[in-house]
Amino acid sequence: MKTLTEYLKFHTKTHRAYVHITPQVEEIVRKSGVKEGMVLVSAMHITAGVYVNDNESGLIEDIDQWLEHLAPFRKNYKHHETGEDNGDSHLKALLIHHEVIVPVTAGKLDLGTWQRIFYAEFDGQRDKRVIVKVMGE
């Protein structure tokens, strides 16, 4: 079985950001030489996530508003009693999840017509990483 592991690095300019990473993942899959298998894409931080959805700006805004509605920034999270101020970021990341697995078929990502891979940042303006691990034959 072939494997290839690479890391994508991020340092967003804003506290929350949604970054389309399909092209970077496609390039890593191509570089791996894997024709049939899968790729794991996983945020290596507890205040970030990875998800698959449409790359449409209105939908991205809807996702952001939905997450803010479910886990708004506020000062009274128990987590803040530790001196932190990012309780909402942890909850948003739980809702998005931290990883996706995408099939690789004929050497390419086997995504649906509108499916794209995104990195979701909820506590930005600092260095973060995403691991991309391709496995297969």
Question: Model-found features: residue ranges?
Answer:
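Active-site histidine-anchored catalytic micro-motif
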Residues: 1-137
